[in-house]
Swiss-Prot record:
The species this protein was found in: Caenorhabditis elegans
InterPro entries, sorted: ADF-H, ADF-H/Gelsolin-like_dom_sf, ADF/Cofilin
Record protein name field: Actin-depolymerizing factor 1, isoforms a/b
Oligomeric and partner information: Interacts with F-actin.
A GO MF label: actin filament binding
Top-level taxon in the UniProt lineage: Eukaryota
Claim: Plastid is one of the keywords in the record: no
Amino acid sequence: MSSGVMVDPDVQTSFQKLSEGRKEYRYIIFKIDENKVIVEAAVTQDQLGITGDDYDDSSKAAFDKFVEDVKSRTDNLTDCRYAVFDFKFTCSRVGAGTSKMDKIIFLQICPDGASIKKKMVYASSAAAIKTSLGTGKILQFQVSDESEMSHKELLNNCPDNAPVRRRMLYASSVRALKASLGLESLFQVQASEMSDLDEKSVKSDLMSNQRI
């Protein structure tokens, strides 16, 4: 359901300065003011005062400062906001080694401590700001408490760095692979750790399967 909240043109303009070209901004915080989504803060890398390579710590120092800014502007997460953050991190790919990645994350921050009315307004207005930003350019996260906005939580859920998503992808694709290779009749061993692949464990699984 639409809330009737409009999006200020400066929202898209500022976002372009974060997502395109020289990437002037590192993060932007948006708020709803008088039925309009506006830019509350647009922070540059220089303003963060971080001189090291963001890829070395997967943006942790920058992200920690971003979280503190959000907490300050929401009175310790008792108010709602939207935000975008340019997340730089490294990930390991099989056969490709370590790669540097850049993802823009969009946070819909509706903390448990905010009023029900505020949460409803921000939830119903989220589609409007995401459309303005362009959903194809952002990874979307919903935040209801500080733990869901932790650096570790978001890093683990970024594509190419998400162990849970990789396991889900492999699990959902195994049937198609077996059908393509004509392996439907073969016995299948699932391994969640290296001990599941030792000879004794595999033999035990084979014997158990024969008894069924």
